[in-house]
Regions:
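A conserved beta-strand element that flanks and buttresses the S-adenosyl-L-methionine
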Residues: 179
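A short glycine-rich, Lys/Arg-flanked "PGG" loop and its adjoining helix->strand segment in the class I
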Residues: 191-206
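Short, glycine-/aromatic-enriched active-site segment of Class I SAM-dependent methyltransferases
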Residues: 209-227
Length: 256
């Protein structure tokens, strides 16, 4: 058993933070949450900057942070990149890119959708759905390995390995649409995203995105390590940054 193997490794090297962290992952998968928290905390005692342990402890203990650590997101998706499409599309019946693409086309009507920025493009699943309807398609993502998979699809005019807020803060923005599928669930606090698009984009663009829905107020870090967002939270951002909400709906997006 994996847990026993980690314990043996720790008996030889008690300050092996990675073993504690990996043991936490295994215990969490087994549903032994209290033991998982204990293992993660031991990893943090040795390695305080352990992004995975820090984020998961927050998630399992009900502490909502503003955003997931960059290193956590990068490590998660770099490790997941090669099997991402197979796992999501075929096994989990992942529908978000198709839903977002269909919604965008319905809102836009006839003619080209112009220039689109795919925020957190991953392997390019949204790009495959939307490319034929726009004149320019760019993508950004934190995971280098996910971007390598996206390049193989050959649908993006430009791809950048960069954080969303960093890109929105520093790059020239001239887009008709900003789209994001299953990405804000790792961002949490969305104020900067809404503000930067509103204040820095050269044209009047639209933002189309998915979140995991919660009936609670605000946004919350769930035990899954993902953030959920309420409709009232999104409405408050629209009001604060002068957006108009054209559409809101809930739907089953994938098996879990």
């Amino acid at each position: 058993e994996a847990v026993e193997a980690y314990k043996k490794a720790l008996a030889v090297k008690p300050d092996y933070a990675e073993a504690y962290s990996n043991m936490g992952v295994t215990l969490q998968q087994q549903g032994k949450l209290e033991e998982a928290i204990e293992a993660y905390n031991k990893a943090l005692a040795i390695q305080p900057n352990n992004a995975t342990a820090s984020h998961v402890v927050s998630a399992l203990t009900g502490l909502t942070t503003n955003t997931a650590p960059r290193a956590y997101v990068e490590n998660l998706f770099d490790g997941y990149a090669k099997q991402f499409d197979e796992s999501l599309v075929k096994r989990l019946e992942y529908r978000i890119p198709k839903i977002i693409s269909d919604l965008a086309q319905n809102l836009h009507g006839t003619g080209s959708m112009g220039s689109i920025l795919d925020l957190g493009c991953g392997t390019g699943l949204l790009g495959l759905e939307i490319k034929e309807y726009c004149s320019n398609l760019e993508g950004i993502d934190l995971s280098y390995q996910m971007l390598e998979q996206a390049r193989k699809n050959n649908v993006y005019d430009n791809l950048n390995h960069i954080d969303i807020v960093e890109h929105l803060s520093e790059s020239e923005l001239d887009f008709d649409y900003f789209m994001s599928t299953d990405v804000f669930i790792y961002v949490g606090e969305l104020s900067d995203v809404f503000r930067l698009i509103k204040t820095r984009n050269k044209r009047s663009g639209r933002l189309i995105f998915s979140t995991e829905h919660t009936e609670l107020n605000g946004f919350h870090l769930e035990q899954s390590g993902r953030y959920s967002h309420s409709k009232s939270y999104i409405e408050s951002l629209c009001s604060k940054f002068d957006y108009s909400m054209f559409h809101f709906s809930t739907a089953p997006l994938r098996k879990d």
